[in-house]
From Swiss-Prot:
SUPFAM superfamilies, A to Z: HAD-like
Annotated gene: timm50
Species whose genome carries this gene: Danio rerio (Zebrafish)
Assigned protein family: Belongs to the TIM50 family.
Bias kind Basic and acidic residues: ranges: 77-93
A single GO BP: protein import into mitochondrial matrix
Protein name: Mitochondrial import inner membrane translocase subunit TIM50
Transit peptide interval: 1-26
Record's bilayer topology term: Single-pass membrane protein
Phenotype of null mutants: Massive apoptosis in the CNS, probably due to loss of mitochondrial function and increased cytochrome c release.
PROSITE patterns associated with the record: FCP1 (PS50969)
Length: 387
C-alpha cells in the first residue's frame, strides 16, 4: 500500500472522529449514522487502515449510546432526595411553630379573659350613690375576695336557671266573696294550644288549634286555668293575649318558673301553691310533669291539622272529672298514665260504658216485662178463685 493511499484514509478517519464529537454534543443519532455510512463505503475499497478507523468509530458510537441510556448517577438522585427531605422538614418545622404560636396566643387570651371575668364579677356591688355594699367576703385577702365573689355569682346564676324563680309560683287561693274553682288546670302553649310554622314569605307564625275557645268556655267555671309554658315570657305573653281575649286564663307562668332537669324544663306541681290532688297538667311531653307523673295528661303533639278535634274531647274528659266531684284526680289520671293517646282511650272507655249501660237498661226492661206478665197471670188466677 502506498503512502498516498494511506494519507487520505487517515484524513478521513480524523474527520470522522471530529464529526463524532460534534454528534455527541448535539446528542442526535442520525449524524452518527451518516458518519458510519460513508466510512463503511470507503473501508470496503481500502486497506486494513480503514477497518481500524471503522472499529474506532463504532466503539465510540456504542459508548455514546450507552452513556445516553444509562440512568443519572446515584449521587444526583440522593441530592434531589436530600433537597426534598430538607423542604419537608422545613415545612414541618414551620407548621409546628405556627401551632405553637396559636396555642400561646390562645393561652394568653384565655388568661386575659379569666382575669377580666374575675375582676368584673368579683368586685363589690354598689348602691345608687356608688358606695360599695359590704358582704361576707370583705375580711378575706383581695384576690380571694374576687375569686369567691365570682364563684358565688356563677353559682347563683346556675341556680336561677335550674330552680324555679320562687317556691310559690301562684298566689294563695281566693277567699270569699270571690270564687275559687275547685280544680286547677295547667296547660302548655306550644304544640298543645298553638303550633309554630315557618315559611320564607312570613317567617315564624303560630297556628291556633281548633277548639281553644270551646275549651276555655266549658272549663272556666270548673277549673282555675293556668298557662305554664316552657317558652320565654317575651315570646309567650303576646300569644296568650291573642288566644284569650276574654280573659279565661287566670295566671301565666313561663320558662323561668320551670325546674331544669336532664335537659328538660320540668313543671313542679309542688311549687304551684295548690292542693296537688286537684291539679291536672296537660302537656305533649311526659318529661314536663316527670316529678309528679300521675298529675299529668300527655296529649299527642299537634302537627297543625285543621281537622283536629282533640281539644273538644279533652274538654269533655276534664268536665267529666270535675262534675263527678273526684277527690283526688291522680287516681283517675293514673289509669291513663301509660296510654299513648289518653283522649282516644277515654273515648273507647266511654263508648264501652255506654254499651254496658244500654245493655243494663235493656235487661232491666226485659225483667220488668217478665215480672209484669207473671203478676198479671197470678192476679187473674187469684180473682177467679175468690169468685
Amino acid at each position: 500500500m502506498s503512502a498516498v493511499s494511506v494519507y487520505p484514509m487517515c484524513v478521513r478517519a480524523s474527520r470522522g472522529l471530529l464529526r463524532l464529537r460534534q454528534g455527541a454534543r448535539c446528542s442526535t443519532a442520525p449524524p452518527l449514522l451518516d458518519v458510519v455510512r460513508p466510512l463503511s463505503a470507503d473501508t470496503s475499497s481500502s486497506s486494513a487502515t480503514g477497518g481500524l478507523a471503522q472499529a474506532i468509530l463504532q466503539e465510540r458510537l456504542q459508548q455514546q449510546q450507552k452513556s445516553q441510556e444509562q440512568p443519572p448517577p446515584e449521587g444526583e438522585d440522593s441530592g434531589h432526595k436530600q433537597d426534598e427531605q430538607g423542604e419537608d422538614k422545613k415545612q414541618k418545622e414551620n407548621t409546628a411553630y405556627a401551632k405553637k404560636m396559636v396555642l400561646r396566643l390562645a393561652g394568653i387570651m384565655g388568661l386575659g379573659g379569666t382575669v377580666g371575668i374575675v375582676y368584673i364579677f368579683g368586685s363589690n356591688s354598689v348602691d345608687e350613690q356608688g358606695n360599695k355594699i359590704p358582704d361576707e367576703f370583705d375580711n378575706d385577702v383581695p384576690v380571694i375576695q374576687q375569686l369567691r365573689r365570682t364563684f358565688k355569682y356563677f353559682k347563683d346564676y346556675r341556680q336561677m336557671i335550674i330552680e324555679p324563680t320562687s317556691p310559690k309560683l301562684l298566689p294563695d287561693p281566693l277567699r270569699e266573696p270571690y270564687y275559687q274553682p275547685p280544680y286547677t288546670l295547667v296547660l302548655e302553649l306550644t304544640d298543645v294550644l298553638l303550633h309554630p310554622e315557618w315559611s320564607l314569605a312570613t317567617g315564624w307564625r303560630f297556628k291556633k288549634r281548633p277548639g281553644i275557645d270551646y275549651l276555655f268556655q266549658q272549663l272556666a267555671p270548673l277549673y282555675e286555668i293556668v298557662i305554664f309554658t316552657s317558652e320565654t315570657g317575651m315570646t309567650a305573653y303576646p300569644l296568650i293575649d291573642s288566644i284569650d281575649p276574654q280573659g279565661f286564663v287566670m295566671y301565666r307562668l313561663f320558662r323561668d318558673a320551670t325546674r331544669y332537669m336532664e335537659g328538660h324544663h320540668v313543671k313542679d306541681v309542688s311549687c304551684l301553691n295548690r292542693d296537688t290532688s286537684k291539679v291536672i297538667v296537660v302537656d305533649c311531653k311526659r318529661e314536663a310533669f316527670g316529678l309528679q307523673p300521675f298529675n299529668g295528661l300527655a296529649l299527642c303533639k299537634w302537627d297543625g291539622n285543621s281537622e283536629d278535634r282533640t281539644l273538644y274531647d279533652l274538654a269533655a274528659f276534664l268536665k267529666t272529672i270535675a262534675t263527678s266531684g273526684v277527690e283526688d284526680v291522680r287516681s283517675v289520671l293514673e289509669n291513663y298514665a301509660h296510654e299513648e293517646d289518653p283522649i282516644e282511650a277515654f273515648k273507647r272507655r266511654q263508648a264501652q260504658l255506654a254499651r254496658e249501660e244500654e245493655q243494663r237498661i235493656s235487661e232491666m226492661a226485659q225483667q220488668k216485662k217478665q215480672g209484669f206478665s207473671l203478676g198479671t197471670i197470678a192476679g187473674r188466677f187469684w180473682s177467679r178463685k175468690q169468685q
